[in-house]
Amino acid sequence: SVIPFEVGRSSSGRVTRGHRFMGARSIEIHTADEYMDKLYDNYVIVDHNKRREKMLSGISAIGKELAATVDAQPRLVEENCFLVEYPVPFYGSFDKAFLELPEEVLTTVMVHHQRYMPVRGSDGKLKPYFVGISNNRATEMGVVVDGNERVLRARFADAAFFWEKDLERPLS
C-alpha cells in the first residue's frame, strides 16, 4: 500500500514517470515488486550497480572495437553512473594534431571538463578518441557523437591557444 506523504508540491502515489525522452510519461505501479522492472522497461535503471554494469559493458565493447584501452577511471565511472538513468556509452574522435599538446592538458579537458574517458593504445599513449556516456539512446547517435566532438574540439582549441601563449613566456 502507498504510504501517504508530501515533499514540496509532490504527493506519494502509485504513478511515476519513465525516462524523460524514451519512457512513458505515466507509469502506474501496483506493487513494490514491479517497481524496478516497470521503470527498466521505460529506460530507467534504478539500481546504480546495474547502471554501472551496463556502462562498463558498453565501455569494454568500445575498447575492443577500437583495439585500445578505455581509461575508465573509477571516480569518473561512478560520477557518470549517478548522472544518468540509462547509460549509453559512445565514442568520438578528435584531430590527431591535438595529440601534440601535453597529455595532462588533454586528459584534464576530457576527464574533468567533459567527463569523457581517454582512450589509449597498447603502448599506453593517448589515441585520438574519447568515450562519453549519454543518458539517451538517440535514434541518431551520430548527432550525439558529432555534438560531443564539436564541444571537445572547441575545448582543445582553447587549450592549444593558452598552451602556446604560456610557451611565449619563459619561466625565469
PLM regions with names:
Residues 1-168:
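His/Asp/Glu-rich acidic catalytic environments and adjacent acidic regulatory segments
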